[in-house]
Amino acid sequence: MVMLGQVVALAMASSAVALNCKNHNVLSNYNVANKDILLKNELDTPPSKTSEMWYLAPCEDGSRRQRPSECSSDDLMCAIRHVKVDGSDHLTQKLDVHKSAKYEVEEVESGGFDIRFLGVKWGSNTIDATLSYSCDTNLKTDELVTTIWNSEYVLIEMSGPSGCKRDGNSDSGDNGNGNGNGNDPDNNNNTGKDKKSKKTSWFTWLFVYAILFTVIYLMVVSYLNTKGGSFQDFRNEFVERGTEFITSLPTFVKEVVTKTLGTRDSSASRGGYSAV
């Protein structure tokens, strides 16, 4: 019974900690999936020089190509601090966040997201470690912005492509709403195009129907006038009436436009006055 309880507990732990970014409801929208990052920072701490190295591979299903030899293969995050003084190099601090760590993921309103590892053991201390990603489309690789490392918590702020939403979800491409309209969250651009397309389609069909009805009318009239005659008679009648219609069409259109504009001008000239 005790062994069964241990097996169940182990299964629950492993299912709770697997951070598969490609299938995560938040991280799958960002460029962090399948990436590992190696960041370095040097501080002038007289009389010594302090160098920090941060290895970040928060996605368990991601790459481990940049992992330094000091970090474990199952690390989701690894921090190493060296101090150089009097020509000698000393490893003073090391933090490992293994894939067994619990985590929280939260999107940031200003853009990007945070991954927070909870209850990480660091010697006798239990701390939280936060990876904060922000988007910068001008950068090709992620750059370190701020680091805080003390006995209570660790904070690493980065800026670069990992904090940007993927193509089809990015703010620059679809505002994160997945409709591919960039800075047009209400789909106004597509709406305008749809309206224009509908107007064009409506006019095209109106023109087609007008031509169709005209041809039918000419055929009916030509048939009635040549009823009992030969096909050649019908053809000659149809061609003659069609030619007359085409030649008279400009005059007809001009007359309609003149009458329409004349009516409007007449109405406008009497605007504001009433009959006495």
UniProtKB/Swiss-Prot annotation:
This is Autophagy-related protein 27. The lineage of its organism: Eukaryota, Fungi, Dikarya, Ascomycota, Saccharomycotina. Residues 19-200 are lumenal. Residues 182-191 have a biased composition (Low complexity). Effector of VPS34 phosphatidylinositol 3-phosphate kinase signaling. Regulates the cytoplasm to vacuole transport (Cvt) vesicle formation. Plays a role in ATG protein retrieval from the pre-autophagosomal structure (PAS) and is especially required for autophagy-dependent cycling of ATG9. Residues 1-18 form the signal peptide. It is found in: Cytoplasmic vesicle membrane; Golgi apparatus membrane; Mitochondrion membrane; Preautophagosomal structure membrane. It comes from the Eukaryota. GO terms for molecular function: phosphatidylinositol-3-phosphate binding. Residues 222-276 are cytoplasmic. It is a single-pass type I membrane protein; Single-pass membrane protein. Residues 19-166 form the MRH domain. One of its GO terms (biological process) is pexophagy. Residues 162-196 are annotated as: Disordered. Keywords: Autophagy, Cytoplasmic vesicle, Disulfide bond, Glycoprotein, Golgi apparatus, Membrane, Mitochondrion, Protein transport, Signal, Transmembrane, Transmembrane helix, Transport.
